[in-house]
Amino acid sequence: MLVVKKGEGVKVRVRVNGVWYEKYVSPRTLLVDFIRDELGLTGTKVGCDTTTCGACTVIMNGKSVKSCTVLAAQADGAEITTIEGLSSDSKLHPIQEAFKDNFALQCGFCTAGMIMQTYFFLKEHPNPTEEEVRDGIHGNICRCTGYQNIVKAVLDASKRLRS
Ligand code: FES
Ligand code: FES
């Protein structure tokens, strides 16, 4: 069991987007706050802070997680990918391209989480049906788009990733 004296931080060492970071934080620090405030990776958003909306979704040790549900201390030693880790050499990832080309965002607040969930989902389901897409992103809420173009974008992204 982790014992922390009053006023002491816990050491969190994580590899995020290929870079190792080591920080001392309060044991109550949420992973999403660690990512945004300690690492400055503000692409990951906080929508509800209660595991409902999915705006904070990142990949942790190969699985998508809602990072407002995980303590930073629980992520110690983990490999994490955030939205900033998807593009390379200033080139958008095919999923990001598909979201852009299918007008799958409006305000964009849900988009990083939606794309990270899509990234995970398409690894598990490289050639999904529309129904599987809808099921795969059901934990991510979008207040703007009505989901239609998001579903189209995920199906388009699956084609791009297969070609
Ligand atoms: S901010 Fe994490 S699920 Fe909404
Ligand atoms: S684009 Fe605005 S919440 Fe999804």
UniProtKB/Swiss-Prot annotation:
Chain positions recorded as [2Fe-2S] cluster 2 binding sites: C107, C110, C142, C144
UniProt cross-references to InterPro entries, sorted A to Z: 2Fe-2S-bd, 2Fe-2S-bd_dom_sf, 2Fe-2S_ferredoxin-like_sf, 2Fe-2S_ferredoxin-type, Beta-grasp_dom_sf, Diverse_Oxidoreductases, Glyceraldehyde_DH_small
Coiled coil start-end: none
Alphabetized GO MF terms: 2 iron, 2 sulfur cluster binding; glyceraldehyde oxidoreductase activity; metal ion binding; oxidoreductase activity, acting on the aldehyde or oxo group of donors
Cofactor dependence: [2Fe-2S] cluster
SUPFAM superfamilies documented for this protein: 2Fe-2S ferredoxin-like, CO dehydrogenase ISP C-domain like
EC top class named in words: oxidoreductase
Places the protein is found: Cytoplasm
Residues of the 2Fe-2S ferredoxin-type domain: 10-86
Pfam families in the cross-refs: Fer2 (PF00111), Fer2_2 (PF01799)
PROSITE patterns on file: 2FE2S_FER_2 (PS51085)
Bound cofactor: record note: Binds 2 [2Fe-2S] cluster per subunit.
Keywords per UniProt: 2Fe-2S, Cytoplasm, Iron, Iron-sulfur, Metal-binding, Oxidoreductase
GO (cellular component) term, any one: cytoplasm
Residues reported to bind [2Fe-2S] cluster 1: C48, C53, C56, C68
Entries under PANTHER family matching the protein: OXIDOREDUCTASE WITH IRON-SULFUR SUBUNIT (PTHR44379:SF5)
Protein's job: Component of the glyceraldehyde dehydrogenase which is involved the nonphosphorylated Entner-Doudoroff pathway. Catalyzes the oxidation of D-glyceraldehyde to yield glycerate. When the artificial electron acceptor 2,6-dichlorophenol-indophenol (Cl2Ind) is used, the enzyme shows a broad substrate range (glyceraldehyde-3-phosphate, formaldehyde, acetaldehyde, propionaldehyde and isobutyraldehyde), but is most active with D-glyceraldehyde. It is not known which acceptor is utilized in vivo.
Protein name: Glyceraldehyde dehydrogenase small chain
Species: Sulfolobus acidocaldarius (strain ATCC 33909 / DSM 639 / JCM 8929 / NBRC 15157 / NCIMB 11770)
